[in-house]
A protein has these predicted regions:
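Short amphipathic, positively biased membrane-proximal segments
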Residues: 1-323
Length: 323
């Protein structure tokens, strides 16, 4: 049995370790090594491939999480197989896109990402119906224990990140790269910031249900909103604010590491349930969702890709009106 004091020490130690890891990564980039696993192509294609990685992480999280949750629901509705297929396709497309150095959109990946996003939207509708059809409608009890509203939204985000990556490839030769009508860096930054806030809302709801019994449960409701705020502010203010951008990158890196650490904490939560991992078939379904936290990592990678685009845009005279 883990005591509350031990949990506090674990939370403090983990936060310190994540901060040091983020600082180390920050210094690593300063020495000119670029983004982690950075390709050797131009900035726009580099950012597109980083978005592919983010989309793949989100797709992996959704595939595993929906498999567990829908298995628990005995796949009563045959539509419950759809997110498994869509997330698997998104994962395969993202893996191929991460290896693709071409500066133009794929005719295969692009429609897969659109289909993935649409599947997530339809899934959100199904989950909303599942919540509202129960006695009490949109009550706290139903939000806690009915179909999670945020789960299919992660599939929407996977599709969005992938779609943005393909749009970036198409604009890589343009003098003024734009995505969805906005400068590419600004567009990707705002999308990633919105995704971080939405994912935080889902984590906050479930951690509130768990009464924040582990102090580390406060991390995913504090670091990602801070990362989203700094990222959006960096995109909407003057590129001369170097300290702001430095802080934004640092918190995004912290959030990226936090996503993987969160999976470890969820594994600990499963181990603390009755029977622990010996009773894995039950505890994987009843305990905290093991595949969920890396969604933060995927969105943090998207934020870092946005920063590389923002830095590139800073050097272009035609964007200086945007300070």
């Amino acid at each position: 049995m883990v005591s509350q004091t031990q949990l506090r020490l674990l939370a403090v130690g983990t936060t310190t370790a994540l901060g040091l890891a983020a600082l180390s990564w920050q210094k690593h980039e300063k020495r000119g090594r670029g983004l982690l696993f950075s390709p050797s192509e131009g900035t726009t294609v580099d950012a597109a491939r980083t978005l592919n990685r983010g989309a793949g992480l989100l797709a992996t999280s959704v595939a595993l999480d929906s498999a567990l949750e829908h298995y628990r629901g005995d796949f009563q509705n045959r539509a419950m197989y759809t997110p498994l297929a869509a997330s698997t396709l998104s994962l395969l497309a993202s893996g191929q896109g991460q290896q693709d150095p071409d500066a133009f959109a794929s005719k295969v990946r692009d429609p897969i990402y659109v289909l993935t996003g649409l599947t997530g939207l339809v899934g959100t509708g199904f989950h909303l119906y599942n919540v509202t059809k129960r006695p009490g409608g949109m009550s706290w009890s139903n939000l806690f224990y009915a179909a999670p509203l945020g789960a299919p939204a992660a599939l929407v985000l996977s599709g969005l990140l992938g779609y943005y990556s393909e749009q970036l490839r198409n604009t890589s030769g343009d003098a003024e790269p734009r995505v969805m009508g906005l400068p590419a860096g600004k567009s990707v930054a705002l999308m990633a910031a919105a995704g971080l806030l939405g994912t935080t809302a889902e984590a906050g709801l479930l951690h509130f249900r768990g009464s924040f019994q582990n102090p580390a449960m406060y991390l995913p409701v504090t670091a990602p909103p801070l990362a989203a705020t700094l990222l959006a502010t960096s995109a909407l203010t003057s590129p001369r604010r170097r300290r702001l951008r430095w802080a934004s990158r640092l918190v995004l890196r912290f959030t990226a590491f936090m996503g993987f650490a969160g999976a470890g904490f969820h594994a600990l939560g499963i181990a603390r349930n009755n029977g622990g991992w010996r009773n894995w078939r039950q505890n994987l379904q009843a305990g905290p969702p093991l595949p969920a936290p890396p969604s933060f990592t995927g969105l943090a990678l998207a934020g870092l890709a946005a920063h590389s685009l923002l830095d590139e845009e800073k050097e272009l005279a035609q964007y200086r009106w945007w300070k």
